[in-house]
């Protein structure tokens, strides 16, 4: 918006600029993005804003007498994809496909389709899929399109697409089948997930670890532990599959849900032996399962073991272990690990402290929560909506209403940037506080603010109407707000009016 306004002002004040063509504008953008010693990749990576054109940079590069090879363009596009710069990544592959001198691989077609979904949506991706020139490339591109259907929970489209792929003979691996099972699990169609397994067996499509994990979860939903154990035994006998921590954790979770604690603990110990020092994911997955068993020792053991994995321990890792310790009731250790994170963090992520802040407030430790909040501010932490929600709810619970109202105002100021909504109980508690203490003006401002945010309810309006009656004030504007909010009047409201 600001850029458009700037160009509009320049156009009005300097007529010579209005005579410049679109081509000269593109050239000026390209020149600002490129210096004499830049290579093609550096020039494109400098395009920070999506509106700027990677296509223009490539074309300018080629027009200047340089070459752009398939391998170089491929590398740049994949790097941009990893950085979530989808528009520029798509522009590169689109330009590449239009060049007769450059060949698109099957993987290029698949990635381009994936990028089309991210930038333009499924409809355009479907159109592109039908234009892919050969079966090898279609085979590669079918998975990202199917994944798009799964992500959108588009069951009918996914099923129709699978029928089409089957007719073309393109279902030769477990991956499309796994996508369908994920879709059926997400939409609670567990019997259909089992039908996918039957189809795989009928067509002799080999299963992988994910296939078995999804199969076990579907069986758990339909027929319980015994059928899950049968699937697990079949997996053990499958020479093409190695049972790892993920399958064992799936089995352990089934046991936990079934109340078979001893079996769950035995399987979790077996899963721990499958962990490696290559990746931390398994450690934290098992840690959460131990937490569900209220097994503090298991949480500690996995936390310490995870430190043997190379690389920096992330904020997400710290959030996981602190959350687990809070859930098993060990706030002392949770605080110790929080302080460990704080001593090593590069950027102060308020989400980490929010976990401990929430634990303090839920346990009635208001002074500890207030002290932690002040400490995070001193350290440069920036409160988010969750911070204010935690403080607001804690202060309402402890009767510190002035502080709660202040936190509410700060939380409301953030509503335009997020989808957070305070609970109706908290809003009603604040309204009742205003009513009890005769704070008529404050109550009016509060309910109007809640109305503008679309959060008003019948109990809130009742409270404000009672105050209007007590103060002998007209309530026409309140009734108008109720009408806009489509609040139906009950007998109590009618009596007040």
What positions do the PLM features span?
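C-terminal interaction modules of eukaryotic adaptor/scaffold proteins
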Residues: 436-497
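C-terminal structural cap/anchor segments
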Residues: 361, 367-436, 446-449
């Amino acid at each position: 918006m600001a850029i458009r306004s700037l160009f509009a002002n320049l156009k009005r004040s300097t007529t010579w600029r209005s005579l410049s063509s679109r081509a000269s504008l593109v050239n000026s953008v390209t020149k600002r993005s490129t210096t004499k010693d830049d290579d093609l990749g550096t020039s494109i990576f400098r395009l920070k804003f999506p509106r700027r054109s990677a296509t223009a940079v490539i074309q300018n590069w080629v027009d200047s007498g340089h070459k752009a090879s398939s391998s170089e363009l491929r590398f740049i596009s994949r790097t941009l994809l990893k950085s979530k710069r989808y528009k520029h990544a798509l522009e590169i592959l689109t330009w590449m496909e239009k060049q007769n001198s450059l060949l698109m691989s099957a993987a290029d077609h698949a990635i381009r389709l994936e990028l089309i979904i991210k930038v333009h949506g499924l409809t355009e991706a479907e159109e592109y899929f039908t234009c892919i020139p050969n079966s090898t490339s279609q085979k590669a591109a079918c998975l990202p399109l199917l994944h798009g259907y799964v992500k959108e929970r588009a069951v009918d489209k996914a099923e129709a697409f699978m029928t089409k792929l089957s007719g073309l003979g393109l279902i030769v691996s477990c991956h499309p089948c796994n996508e369908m099972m994920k879709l059926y699990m997400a939409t609670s169609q567990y019997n259909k997930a089992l039908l996918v397994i039957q189809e795989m067996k009928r067509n002799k499509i080999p299963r992988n670890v994910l296939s078995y994990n999804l199969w076990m979860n579907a069986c758990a939903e339909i027929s319980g532990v015994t059928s899950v154990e049968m699937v697990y035994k079949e997996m053990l006998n499958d020479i093409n599959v190695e049972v790892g921590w993920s399958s064992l954790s799936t089995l352990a979770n089934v046991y936990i849900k079934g109340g078979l604690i001893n079996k769950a603990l035995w399987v979790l110990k077996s899963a721990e032996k499958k962990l490696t020092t290559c990746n931390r994911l398994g450690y934290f997955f098992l840690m959460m399962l131990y937490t569900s068993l209220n097994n503090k020792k298991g949480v500690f053991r996995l936390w310490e073991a995870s430190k043997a994995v190379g690389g920096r321990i992330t904020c997400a890792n710290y959030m996981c272990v602190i959350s687990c310790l809070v859930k098993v009731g060990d706030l002392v250790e949770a605080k110790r690990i929080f302080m460990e994170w704080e001593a090593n963090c590069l950027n102060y992520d308020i989400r980490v402290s929010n976990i401990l802040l929430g634990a303090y407030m839920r346990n009635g430790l208001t002074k500890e929560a207030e002290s932690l909040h002040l400490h995070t501010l001193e350290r440069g932490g920036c409160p988010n909506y969750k911070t204010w929600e935690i403080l607001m709810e804690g202060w309402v619970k402890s009767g510190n209403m002035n502080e709660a109202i202040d936190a509410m105002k700060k939380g409301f100021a953030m509503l335009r940037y997020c989808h957070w909504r305070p609970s109706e109980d908290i809003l009603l508690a604040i309204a009742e506080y205003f009513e009890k203490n005769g704070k008529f003006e404050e109550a009016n401002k509060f309910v109007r603010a809640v109305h503008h945010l679309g959060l008003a309810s019948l109990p809130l309006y009742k409270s404000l109407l009672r105050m209007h009656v007590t103060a002998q004030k007209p309530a026409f504007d309140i009734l108008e707000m109720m009408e806009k909010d489509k609040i139906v009047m009950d007998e109590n409201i009618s009596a007040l009016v």
